[in-house]
Design a protein with these regions (language model features):
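Bacterial N-terminal signal peptides that target proteins for export
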Residues: 4-19
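Flexible "cap/lid" subdomain of the alpha/beta-hydrolase fold that forms the substrate-access gate
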Residues: 40-44, 48-53, 63-65, 112-148, ...
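Conserved beta-strand scaffold positions in the cores of enzyme catalytic domains, especially
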Residues: 55-57, 104-106, 341-344
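Catalytic active-site module of serine/aspartate enzymes centered on a nucleophile-bearing elbow/loop
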Residues: 338-369
Length: 369
């Protein structure tokens, strides 16, 4: 992602902290969203780009979800993807952990792939998303699981562990730290800093669905422009004016000159096909709940995550904005007293589990054992 497109104007210390601890924007209330009865209603052994993966569909929390699964025995590890991704982001982890004796499951999250995508924006708040995760355990007949989340999956995983520690007994968060609920409405803070300049989170919150209209017009361009390493070469951006009025997001990024070595053409084709089916509105609705999530979390301010936790990110991930291990540890230690380790992988960017699968898998196995 083009750094200038995300950072203009210069980020102040206050807003930098807000962005580093982005996970706290998604805090929520456990009341009012008890998981409904869940069940597996269909199993499909075929139609998977990853050999050995079994697809199944479950009914839970008012929606139909697709699960990708490997390994039928052993402790359950639940992988939660972010934006703009799919279950397929976890392909390397599904193979490695199932080979190590774990039962591993990666859903298409609400609004993605072949999982249902409700129209109502409030159906994507963190309360609903956390209830979806519990519903998966219920459908699989599992009492507990380790939950692993990346990008938007990180706050979902964090809050699932916060609200349901008896079900999610270990937590791994990737790229997006968790530091509890902040004092200021996060969207108000962003608007105060960026004003009439472009910032993608504010763009995703504009009325009228402008963001998904842009992204749906060319899913391949968006995904190929996002799925890159920090040093991947790009074309020059078509828009360099920082003002929102100058245009949308894609012309600001700069198209990729080629795929990174960790992403094959077949990988990209599969993920593109998933967004051609589902569109981008579901994923954008996660951003549209940032303010709602903040408003309904007041009674969670004093809660902390009690389960053992690992944080993992690429050292060049722009979400952490150059934070050191010590800075990240300090920002999370109050909200996660049992934060066992912070791992930053050098020369790795945002797509950590795909860019560095060997190191990611080893970190997961060390933590799980």
């Amino acid at each position: 992602m083009n750094r200038e497109a995300l950072e203009l104007p210069l980020v102040t210390k206050r807003i930098k902290k807000l962005l580093i601890i982005f996970g706290l924007m998604m805090a929520t209330n456990a009341i009012g969203s008890s998981p409904t009865e869940s069940k597996i209603n269909e199993v499909n052994m075929n139609n998977s780009p990853l050999e050995g993966v079994k697809f199944s569909f479950i009914e839970t929390n008012g929606i139909r979800m697709r699960l990708a699964e490997m390994g039928s025995e052993g402790p359950l590890v639940l992988f939660v993807h972010g934006w703009p991704e799919s279950w397929y982001s976890w392909r390397h982890q599904l193979i490695a952990l199932s080979n190590a004796g774990y039962r591993v499951v990666a859903p298409d999250m609400r609004g993605y792939g072949e999982t249902d995508a409700p129209e109502e924006i409030d159906q994507y708040d963190i309360e609903q998303l956390s209830a979806d995760m519990v519903g998966i355990l219920d459908a699989l007949g599992e009492e507990t699981a380790t939950i692993v989340g990346h990008d938007w999956g990180a706050p979902v995983a964090s809050h699932s562990a916060l609200l349901y520690p008896d079900r999610f007994t270990k937590l791994v968060i990737m790229s997006v730290p968790y530091s509890g609920r902040q004092d200021q409405n996060p969207l108000e803070g962003l608007r105060a800093v960026f004003k009439d300049n472009f910032f993608y989170i504010l763009y995703h919150n504009e009325p009228g669905g402008v963001a998904e209209k842009e992204y749906d017009s060319d899913p391949r361009l968006l995904l190929s422009s996002f799925y890159l390493s920090p040093d991947s070469p790009r074309e020059k951006p078509q828009i360099t004016d920082s003002k929102r009025s100058a245009g949308g997001f894609l012309p600001r990024i700069g198209a990729a000159k080629g795929l990174p070595d960790w992403l094959t053409q077949e990988d990209l084709d599969y993920v593109v096909s998933q967004f051609e089916k589902a569109g981008f509105r579901g994923g954008i609705n996660y951003y549209r709940n940032i303010e709602r999530n903040w408003k309904i979390t007041e009674d969670l301010e004093d809660l902390s995550i009690k389960v053992p936790t690992l944080f993992l990110a690429g050292a060049q991930d722009m979400v952490i904005r150059g934070a050191t291990k010590e800075m990240l540890q300090s920002s999370m230690e109050k909200s996660i007293p049992d934060l066992q380790e912070v791992i930053l992988l050098p020369n790795i960017g945002h797509w950590v589990q795909q860019e560095a699968p060997v190191e990611t898998n080893q970190a997961l196995l060390n933590f799980l054992q």
